[in-house]
From Swiss-Prot:
Record PTM Leucine amide, positions in chain: L16
Keyword Secreted: yes
Record-linked InterPro entries: Pyrokinin_CS (IPR001484)
GO cellular component, one term: extracellular region
GO MF entry, a single one: neuropeptide hormone activity
Subcellular location, principal: secreted
Domain of life: Eukaryota
Biological role: Myoactive.
Source taxonomy: Eukaryota, Metazoa, Ecdysozoa, Arthropoda, Hexapoda
Keyword annotations: Amidation, Neuropeptide, Secreted
Family assignment from sequence similarity: Belongs to the pyrokinin family.
Name of the featured protein: Pyrokinin-5
Length: 16
């Protein structure tokens, strides 16, 4: 959505 890892989903999640 807005996070840096929205594509992979391994950074922080959808939006943090």
């Amino acid at each position: 959505s807005a996070s840096s890892g929205e594509s992979s989903g391994m950074w922080f999640g959808p939006r943090l």
